[in-house]
């Protein structure tokens, strides 16, 4: 996760203290985030086709699937290190600090897949393996962000204490999946299928950010700025699916 901000407060005369010159500043930084795994139940629908090779127990086919996953992984109280500086009254001052993100979330909401497969049939069943592309909707969420800077060793909420920002971005990304499974025919019309699938989205980058403002307090005047950030990575999804299928 990478994050930066730009600061543009105007000149200000506080109720307490001397007048202050305007400030122009910026900071940036980044960090790695280790997301925990998430387990949940989700619905799935699929349609497929298979056919035997001539005079053989071997078969080929393809399966199109839709999975409404709605799986979210969350890291709370994530710190994004920052370094930068500001200019006030012609004097430049360097500083470092952190952006505090109360919760950072990566979600995979839904996924389409199309997987050709090869299999081998038995008396009333067949087993198969396959692989193919996926198209997934993912979501990146950063909730309740506050930017802190260390001025002379004292942490200061640059974006305003209690003045948080939140961002959420959805996008569709390509990926790939592989599956292995088996189908058992209950009769000529119905079958039961059990399969394991693992998929991985492509490495994607999400841009997020926007303006923020703080009304000021008795010491400091109003501040405005812009958050600018990116998040990059991929999502691995593993599923075990049990389905009842109609044969036609």
Residue ranges and their predicted role:
Residues 39, 46-48, 58:
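Mid-chain, structured segments of secreted extracytoplasmic proteins
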Residues 118-121, 170-172, 182-185, 233-234:
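Exposed beta-sheet edge/beta-hairpin loop segments within beta-rich domains
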Residues 3, 45-51, 64-66, 110, ...:
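Residues on the lipid-exposed face of transmembrane beta-strands in outer-membrane beta-barrel proteins
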Residues 54-59, 127-135, 144-150, 175-176, ...:
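Membrane-topology and secretion signals of cell-surface/extracellular proteins
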């Amino acid at each position: 996760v990478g994050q930066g901000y730009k600061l543009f407060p105007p000149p200000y005369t506080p109720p307490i203290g001397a007048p202050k010159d305007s400030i122009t500043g910026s900071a940036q930084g980044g960090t790695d985030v280790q997301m925990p795994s998430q387990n949940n139940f989700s619905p799935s629908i699929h349609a497929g086709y298979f056919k035997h090779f001539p005079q053989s127990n071997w078969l080929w086919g393809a399966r199109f699937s839709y999975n409404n996953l709605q799986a979210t992984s969350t890291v709370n109280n994530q710190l994004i290190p920052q370094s930068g500086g500001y200019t006030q009254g012609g004097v430049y001052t360097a500083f470092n600090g952190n952006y505090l993100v109360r919760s950072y979330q990566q979600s995979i909401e839904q996924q389409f897949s199309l997987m050709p497969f090869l299999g081998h049939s038995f008396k009333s069943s067949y087993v198969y393996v396959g692989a193919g592309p996926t198209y997934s909707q993912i979501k990146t969420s950063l909730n309740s962000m506050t930017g802190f800077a260390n001025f002379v060793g004292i942490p200061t909420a640059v974006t305003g204490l209690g003045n948080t920002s939140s961002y959420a971005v959805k996008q569709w990304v390509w990926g790939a999946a592989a599956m292995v499974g088996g189908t058992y025919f209950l009769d000529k019309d119905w079958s039961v299928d059990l399969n394991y699938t693992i998929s991985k989205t492509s490495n994607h980058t999400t841009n997020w950010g926007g303006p923020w403002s703080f009304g000021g307090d008795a010491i400091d005047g109003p501040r405005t700025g812009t958050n600018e950030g990116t998040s990059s990575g991929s999502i691995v999804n593993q599923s075990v699916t049990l389905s009842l299928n109609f044969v036609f």
